[in-house]
Amino acid sequence: MKDEILDINKIFNNLSENIFIKETNEGLILVDSSSKMTFSLALDDYENIVRQNKKHVLSKIIKKDKLMVLDCTGGFARDSAIISSLGNNVTVIEENLIVMRILKDAMSRIQNREVSCIFKRITTKLGSCLDYIKTTNKIYDYIYFDFMFNTSNTALPSKREQFLRKIVKNDIDINRAIVDEVL
């Protein structure tokens, strides 16, 4: 596979940053040419989730296994991987095409057996979570939102979160509409 660069701005005209997806033999890489920052998603790095899942705050909330969980803010599926590693099935909804493309590419390159088992219990869907909830016949035990855009924190977010903030819009009104739809 030859290196290929996809201009995200051609797909999403409202992005101000100069962000690209570079396709390499090792997988897709996000490139922010204005800051020279790059990010590639390697889900094999989620191996630590297997070791630390019982200590994670999500394990205190979701105490049973074999549950059906809907993740309305899929992103790079880190929280979904934690929930799945606890023995649950997760449906990840992500409406951003770029984020979904990076995630699906990373899922296709998983080498670690434990991480592979975790992601076998994760189903991904591209689209609006609100539309999905209105049309699905599935019943979920939990509906999960990650409000990762806490801008009141002065610490610099991780590289993963910095890229997500540049690509994804956090619309609190849509999140409220989803909650209203389920209640």
Show which residues each predicted segment covers:
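Mobile active-site "lid"/loop adjacent to the S-adenosyl-L-methionine
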Residues: F147-I178
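Short, glycine/charged-enriched secondary-structure capping and boundary segments
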Residues: S84-L86, D105-S108, I139-Y140, P157-R160
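Basic (Lys/Arg-enriched) interaction patch that binds polyanionic ligands
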Residues: M68-I102
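Class I S-adenosyl-L-methionine
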Residues: K2-I5, D141, L156, L183
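A short, acidic, amphipathic alpha-helical segment used as a generic capping/interface helix at domain edges
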Residues: S128-Y132, N170-L183
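Conserved proline-anchored active-site loop of SAM-dependent methyltransferases
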Residues: V69-I82, Y140-S158
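S-adenosyl-L-methionine
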Residues: M1-V69, A77, S85, I93-Y142
